């Protein structure tokens, strides 16, 4: 489940090389020997060998070329002194001399002295489909939380392959993508299910028609290889990395493929890296976690009934939600906000407790008779063509990566059985999430076997950060990665649930992230932090 994706979608989707490798690797960049074929017994074998050689060729080439930094284009909306550039990578790492694509990158230099500089810190915000180009703005915005880290590191962002300015892909016309209202995600009949299945199939077909050449190469391992090429282009021998949400899985895959290329790695709000979870089961697990965090928000709203007047028990708040949902299903608010748009708007509350008060306030206004506030918040803006194109692109990348990364059930009966059962006790998100991912059931290109994430030779301690009640990436994912990456440390924010907790308001977490990035030191044992304060109305 990508944040705000429901609201934004239109459907409810050789030999010569080896010789050159040896020559290039002897120069500017060390051979990523750890990225050779993982001994996982799942048939990657020769293809992984070819892609490992291709990644080495591309990294060596990038190290020689560097990056031509210049002022960012005006339509990138990045303030000076942030600089922008491109890094060239193979579309297919098995064919490193074949078609090339350009990846957009940006940076801002460290704010400290030359002697304080430790290198570049590269960021991925998640998705898949999220752009990291806003990361350097944490320096221009003078964020106090990042001030110490900014003294030591250049802040570097990038658009992953397929995203934004990096060979963007598309699955449907953006203006069609944002039209509303969408069909109610909760099916009322078998006919409703057939209609949603048709939309999902058409979306998958649209991805192939509009972006078919890129689809087979839209995988997390390829993005990890891209990340290593960016590292080399920056002139960095080792990677310093901060990944949030899906960015944690990207980091886990990178750490498995290139363990001896990691210097520091912070992963925050962790995707469960188990092959059994990527990606079908992971989305079912999300539905359970979202229901729990939805209830947390309802409890908070009830505790603040004096401010919101939505009921002083969770049951009363839920009753108001069901009434709103039923009204929108019967007659979309403002003609454009139905149940799908409501879920897209209200899902901000389970994602981030910073959204608790704004979401409750708009809900309260609706119950008090002000429908327009909710329409303004939940309806798409058809005049925002740039924003709509970005939203469509983000959803296309999400679908392409998750559908290509792993095998999904092709039998509709499996989807119907699992989601019908789950919906009974976890109704908030289940069917909406199912329809979003259903294009993977009819995906038109080969689906891969996920990498076996594990500790390789040279991997340093990785810092894992996780809130205990995170909805989008349930806590068990952090525990799983902690077990797989030997020597890692886990920081848990107890009884909290915000998704992405580094750089927020808990000094118990922020101070430890700072210490790790600046010194490499971690606590001798895993740490449990008290929760940050709950929001005020």
From Swiss-Prot:
It comes from the Bacteria. Gene3D superfamilies: alpha/beta hydrolase. Residues 119-497 form the AB hydrolase-1 domain. It is an enzyme of class 3 (hydrolase). GO terms for cellular component: extracellular region. InterPro entries: AB_hydrolase_fold, Pept_S33_TAP-like_C, Serine_prot/Carboxylest_S33. Residues 1-36 form the signal peptide. Belongs to the peptidase S33 family. Cleaves tripeptides from the N-termini of proteins. Does not cleave mono- or dipeptides, or N-terminally blocked peptides. This is Tripeptidyl aminopeptidase.
């Amino acid at each position: 489940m990508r944040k705000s994706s429901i609201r934004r979608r239109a459907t409810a989707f050789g030999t010569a090389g080896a010789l050159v490798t040896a020559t290039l690797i002897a120069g500017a960049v060390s051979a990523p020997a750890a990225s050779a074929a993982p001994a996982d017994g799942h048939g990657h074998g020769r293809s992984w060998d070819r892609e490992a050689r291709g990644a080495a060729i591309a990294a060596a080439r990038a190290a020689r070329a560097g990056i031509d930094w210049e002022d960012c284009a005006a339509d990138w909306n990045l303030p000076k002194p942030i600089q922008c550039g491109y890094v060239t990578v193979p579309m297919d790492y098995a064919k490193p001399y074949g078609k090339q694509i350009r990846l957009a990158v940006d940076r801002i230099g460290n704010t400290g002295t030359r002697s304080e500089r430790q290198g570049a810190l590269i960021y991925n915000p998640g998705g898949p489909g999220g752009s990291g180009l806003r990361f350097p703005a944490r320096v221009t915005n003078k964020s106090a939380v990042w001030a110490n880290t900014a003294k030591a590191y250049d802040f570097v962002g990038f658009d992953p392959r397929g995203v934004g300015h990096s060979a963007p892909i598309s699955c449907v016309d953006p203006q069609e993508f944002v039209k509303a209202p969408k069909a109610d995600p909760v099916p009322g009949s078998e006919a409703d299910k057939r209609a949603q299945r048709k939309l999902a199939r058409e979306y998958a077909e649209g991805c192939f028609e509009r972006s078919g050449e890129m689809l087979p190469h839209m995988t997390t391992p390829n993005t990890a290889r891209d990340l290593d090429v960016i590292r080399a282009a920056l002139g960095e021998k080792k990677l310093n990395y901060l990944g949030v949400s899906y960015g944690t899985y990207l980091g886990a895959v990178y750490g498995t493929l290139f363990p001896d290329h990691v210097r520091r790695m912070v992963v925050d709000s962790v995707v469960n890296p188990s092959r059994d979870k990527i990606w079908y089961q992971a989305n079912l697990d999300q539905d359970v976690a979202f229901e729990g965090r939805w209830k947390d928000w309802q409890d908070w709203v009830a505790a603040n009934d004096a401010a919101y007047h939505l009921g002083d028990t969770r049951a009363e708040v839920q009753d108001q939600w069901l009434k709103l949902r039923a009204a929108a299903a019967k007659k979309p608010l403002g003609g454009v906000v139905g149940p799908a748009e409501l879920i897209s708007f209200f899902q901000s509350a389970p994602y981030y407790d910073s959204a608790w008060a704004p979401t409750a306030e708009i809900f309260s206004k609706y119950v008090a008779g002000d429908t327009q506030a909710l329409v303004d918040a939940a309806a798409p803006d058809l005049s925002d063509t740039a924003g709509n194109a970005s939203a469509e692109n983000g959803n296309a990348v999400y679908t392409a990566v998750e559908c290509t990364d792993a095998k999904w059930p092709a039998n509709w009966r499996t989807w119907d059985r699992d989601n019908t059962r789950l919906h009974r006790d976890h109704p908030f998100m289940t069917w909406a999430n199912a329809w979003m991912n259903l294009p993977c059931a009819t995906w038109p290109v080969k689906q891969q076997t996920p990498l076996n994430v594990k500790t390789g030779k040279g991997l340093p301690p990785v810092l894992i950060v996780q809130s205990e009640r995170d909805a989008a990436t349930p806590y068990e994912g952090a525990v799983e990665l902690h077990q797989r990456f030997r020597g890692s440390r886990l920081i848990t924010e107890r009884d909290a649930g915000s998704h992405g907790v580094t750089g927020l308001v808990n000094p118990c977490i922020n101070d430890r992230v700072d210490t790790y990035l600046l010194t490499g030191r971690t606590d001798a044992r895993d740490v449990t932090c008290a929760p940050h304060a709950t929001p005020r109305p």
